[in-house]
């Protein structure tokens, strides 16, 4: 089957023991059925503690998924002190589960092609994007798809192009993208409609209209603060990402209580000047999210809208966490590792499956599809 992937995809190399945020710690490591059956017959390396009869004994069933049971330090029991894998050292790569073998690669199998991307929840991927001025994404050959699917792929391509090529800020373009998606849902989708919505004149008018709108910064900061707290609550209870989350949530609680001793809006203005230097990286991150997450093999226009909401919320909490970290670090120069680590941890925390995204939105909001104003509130 035809394989399509972005220009950066073949450049990825795992940094193994040099990785600053290992994928062998603080999140679910799935074990596929074939690996699980194989592990029933294999003894653990002698330096794994505690010793058990077979590798399968180190797994557990969690949220309908078989995973490796983490130790008290929330690490994989097979992770050595030097951050290398005991299983690989003892048995080679073939012993690993599919998750360990493929991460951070992501595959989506459509009717006539497979799309491959890399996920932002790996520091080495963010490092790759930092070095790329502009990511390049493949187009889907119209002859491979039905007319309906072609229109959906065209929607995605237009959104990617808008984010990559429009000189406005990434936040401004997110607002344009979401507005166009909502408007498209009200009419019969066609190539002519898309050509009109994404024409230079219509985009210009939409951009001017957004520029004239007032988005109270205090409300944006307050809502993003609540979103971060809500997304983090379960991770905090389980003691996951505590080194990253604990100082941020302490500051977030102070903001919610109104006990911070400085003007957040004034600090935000200074922060934005620091954050601007990473605009190319943020644009690469968002365009990759568009390519990898907006359209699934069973997707439609509504699911694209829902995924755009999730991407918008994801970005809002990433940006807010970077802001809080910058505040807690003394409001000086915004370091690259702060931006990278926030992208990695928050995308791990928001890396929900499609059904889980719908469940979260149903439980947290009155309607699955947001008003444009709410999207503008958190992303503006």
Segments (PLM) and residue ranges:
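Conserved aromatic-histidine-acidic binding/catalytic patches
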Residues: 88-92, 110, 147, 151, ...
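Iron-sulfur-associated redox domains of electron-transfer enzymes in respiratory
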Residues: 98, 102, 110-113, 132-138, ...
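Hydrophobic, aromatic-lined core segments that form the binding pocket/scaffold
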Residues: 168-380
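N-terminal cysteine/histidine-rich coordination modules
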Residues: 1-83, 88-97, 101-138
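Generic alpha-helical secondary structure signal
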Residues: 34-37, 150-153, 157, 337
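Detector for Asparagine
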Residues: 7, 38, 71, 82, ...
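Charged, amphipathic alpha-helical linkers/stalks
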Residues: 124-205
């Amino acid at each position: 089957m035809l394989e399509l992937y972005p220009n950066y995809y073949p450049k990825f190399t795992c940094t193994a023991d040099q990785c600053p945020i290992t994928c062998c710690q603080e999140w679910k490591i799935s074990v596929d059925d074939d690996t699980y059956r194989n592990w029933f017959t294999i003894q653990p390396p002698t330096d794994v503690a505690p010793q058990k009869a077979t590798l399968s004994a180190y797994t557990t069933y969690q949220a309908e998924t078989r995973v490796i049971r983490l130790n008290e330090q929330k690490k994989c029991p097979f992770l050595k002190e030097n951050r290398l894998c005991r299983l690989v050292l003892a048995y080679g790569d073939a012993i690993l589960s599919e998750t360990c073998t493929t991460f951070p690669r992501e595959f989506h199998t459509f009717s006539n092609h497979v799309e491959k991307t890399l996920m932002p929840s790996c520091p080495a991927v963010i490092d790759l994007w930092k070095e790329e001025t502009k990511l390049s994404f493949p187009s889907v050959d119209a002859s491979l798809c039905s007319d309906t699917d072609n229109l959906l792929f065209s929607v995605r391509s237009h959104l990617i192009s808008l984010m990559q090529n429009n000189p406005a800020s990434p936040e401004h373009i997110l607002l344009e993208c979401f507005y166009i998606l909502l408007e498209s849902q009200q009419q019969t989708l066609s190539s002519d409609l898309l050509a009109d919505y994404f024409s230079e004149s219509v985009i210009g008018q939409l951009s001017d209209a957004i520029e004239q709108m007032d988005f109270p910064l205090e409300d944006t900061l307050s809502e993003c603060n609540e979103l971060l707290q809500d997304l983090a609550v379960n991770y905090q209870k389980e003691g996951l990402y505590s080194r990253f989350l604990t100082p941020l949530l302490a500051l977030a609680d102070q903001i919610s209580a109104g006990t911070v001793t400085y003007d957040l809006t004034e600090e935000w203005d200074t922060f934005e000047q620091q954050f601007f230097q990473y605009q190319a990286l943020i644009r690469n991150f968002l365009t990759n999210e568009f390519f990898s997450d907006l359209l699934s093999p069973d997707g439609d226009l509504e699911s694209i809208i829902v995924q755009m909401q999730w991407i918008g919320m994801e970005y809002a909490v990433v940006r807010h966490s970077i802001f809080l970290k910058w505040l807690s670090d003394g409001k000086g120069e915004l370091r690259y590792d702060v931006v990278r680590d926030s992208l990695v941890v928050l995308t791990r925390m928001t890396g929900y499956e499609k059904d889980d995204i719908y469940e979260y939105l149903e439980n947290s909001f009155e309607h699955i599809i947001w008003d444009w104003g709410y999207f503008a509130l958190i992303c503006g």
